[in-house]
Amino acid sequence: DTYFVVAHFHIVMGVSAFFGMFAGIYHWFPKMFGRFMNNTLGYIHFFLTFAGAYLIFWPMHYEGIAGMPRRYYDYSAWESFKQFESLNAFISIAAIIVFFAQLLFVVNFFVSIFRGRKCLVQNPWGSPSLEWTTPINPGHGNWPGEIPTVHRWPYDYKDDGHGNDFIPQTTPLREGEESH
């Protein structure tokens, strides 16, 4: 029951969940708001968060392997754990940096809603899945008029013979073609 458990749980469950949420927000932001988030701030946010997460949790793995127990608020009573005081200070500094990186994300999010570069195309990522066939800022029911018919698997990436590496789900299959 050491710091290894804390580090491993948070790097696997916590960090992966947050990166999934951030990826979804960056990906669907143009569809939700009709604008793009700032790319430069997005890259800074990603690299600070990525590096910071590992600067927090890899030293905790090391402390856990060295036998440092979790759920203790003060390690000064044990001489063997005093060697980790500077490492714990380093972890705290890394956590503060990661916190400020999240503030950068929040600023990027809200500023981009009003001042982000306008998304002028319906499908900026060239994604074949159905949600990108709706207009930007879709109204009630998502699609104006008739609901589109799905003919393909949502991730059917392949050359359509015209230089496109994707074919939307709504494109009918050609004769002899199969959806994978």
What is each PLM-predicted segment?
Residues F19-F29, W58, I97-V106, H140-P154:
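Juxtamembrane/interfacial segments around transmembrane helices
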Residues H10, A51, H61, V106:
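Divalent metal-coordination and catalytic microenvironments
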